[in-house]
């Protein structure tokens, strides 16, 4: 960005990462967080234009750097509503029989809280945690250890296509207990399927569900 400005080329910084990336748990050891934070500062100072995904991040740039940005939110495809078939055959799931989390299995998604809270709830519903590990398998193993002994908690692994459609289409509730987000695609998708959504009280989720 510095060199581009020196040579009088316009620079548009597209901050489409999910949230303020340097705050993520995976960057807190070593120099990762400082390096990414410096990149954020450079974007605010030197880019000709900055694009953000959420009003929360837009407010952050205004309050932190006095920088005006352009808000261009995520969008999703029209949903394919499907009856439970594949998910019944593979996981024994039926319509309204489970609470769904679907997303990357990373610490900032709040899945630890979800598992711990669910284990204390008396319900016949299952908790379906759908998604793959983003960086390493260590967090996935931590979650499975946390869920050990509760047969209601199901890990599906990465899903796509008709399987993903069925999970969204037949969930009793979709939940996203994140600590940190940009504009969560999985929440937008869940809402497009008409799901009742239970989300954490952070601006990036609140501005999507509104009420």
What are these regions (language model features)?
Residues 26, 76-91:
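Acidic anion/phosphate-binding donor-loop and adjacent secondary structure
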Residues 158-159, 166-171:
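Short alpha-helical donor nucleotide-sugar binding micro-motif in glycosyltransferases
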Residues 31-50:
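Membrane-proximal helix-turn-helix segments that form the acceptor-binding/catalytic region
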Residues 59, 123-152, 156, 163:
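Short, structured helix-loop element that forms part of the nucleotide-activated donor/catalytic region
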Residues 196-199:
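Short hydrophobic beta-strand element within catalytic cores of glycosyltransferases
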Residues 97, 101, 106-120, 141:
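A conserved mid-protein helix/loop that constitutes part of the nucleotide-sugar donor-binding site
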Residues 179:
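Aromatic "clamp/platform" in nucleotide-sugar-dependent glycosyltransferases that forms part
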Residues 56, 75:
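Carbohydrate-associated surface elements
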